[in-house]
Amino acid sequence: MSDSPVLPRAHGAAVLTAAMRSVAEDFQVDELPAFDASGEGEHLLLSVRKRGQNTAYVAKRLAQWAGIAEMGIGYAGLKDRHAVTTQRFSVHLPKRIAPDLSALDDDDMQVVEHTWHNRKLQRGALHGNRFVLTLREVVGDQTAIDARLHAIAARGIPNWFGEQRFGRDGGNVAAALAMFGYTRQLDGTLAPAPKRRLRNDQRSLLLSAARSALFNQVLTARVEQGDWDAPLDGEAWMLDGSRSVFGPEPWSEVLAERLARFDIHPSGPLWGAGELRCSADAAAIEQAALSDPQSLALRTGLEAAGLKQERRALRLRPQALAHAWLDAQTLQLTFALPPGCYATAVLWELGDVVDAARVAPQSRSEG
């Protein structure tokens, strides 16, 4: 198991090379809220459009503006600074007296909407994200690219965790191993080492990276076998747009119809303590895919950390996927994804896209 493995493509070989995020406007993300504001309460709900600023920076800025601790700021998800993004923040103001909103507006940040709500905005409280991505310096046959996009819209894609989850050069996986009490030798084998003690936020980041690496390992096996979007004996099914899981149960025409209309998806493990939800062939593939020494070390560490077995859909279908050629070498994509899903997974099925923000000296990984 590699810290930054090359993932297989489900739709065949790459059909393009391109660059993304040459400028921040080439990567636009708008949150799709999960609820309407109540219009009352002591949390000021702000919709903020920002350029070149990540979520943590804006949260700190809002806390300073309101004169409150940062724990009084809520947001549903993290957004990268190398982008133009719109997202909600809640600001706890018990007296319902807000400072001058215009003081927040500048060239790189604007409050586009504000209202009151009766509770703090919680992580994950969003319906999804809408993306508008502009790829530049595109090299590839337009007919083949158009066909690949139509195939993605019709069949979906593997629901990979994006490379952002793993840090630069996959370093978060190595850091997770160190946290669990392992060090990698020069020959690639693992040896016991003193466990690293970390802050809670760092620990959470590394636990997520370890889980994500194991999930991607299972998904790799399913893609290589060609059954990432097809039923196996013993499959555990995940409802679309939900964390609900059911099965295993005998294959039937009802399940076939639900799978065909993307109401359910095959699932893979988010590792933790407890029994695998799947069985038979599906469980055999998962155990085989995670039987190497590094995977076993990550599994043991996650179980010891108190995480429980959960599931994640193996398949993802971008919603409202559309594209337009702005010129012969510039392709614009628009689509929406559920929370926790990665736009880079869509781009990977197209080809090799260089992230200009990552190769620039000032770049940092997405948040």
Curated annotation (Swiss-Prot):
Keywords: Isomerase, tRNA processing. It catalyses: uridine(13) in tRNA = pseudouridine(13) in tRNA. Residues 156-316 form the TRUD domain. It comes from the Bacteria. Pfam families: TruD. One of its GO terms (cellular component) is cytosol. It is an enzyme of class 5 (isomerase). The active site is at 80 (nucleophile). Its EC number is 5.4.99.27. PROSITE patterns: TRUD, UPF0024. One of its GO terms (molecular function) is RNA binding. CDD domains: PseudoU_synth_EcTruD (cd02575). SUPFAM superfamilies: Pseudouridine synthase (SSF55120). GO terms for biological process: tRNA pseudouridine synthesis. Belongs to the pseudouridine synthase TruD family. Responsible for synthesis of pseudouridine from uracil-13 in transfer RNAs. This is tRNA pseudouridine synthase D. It comes from Xanthomonas campestris pv. campestris (strain B100).
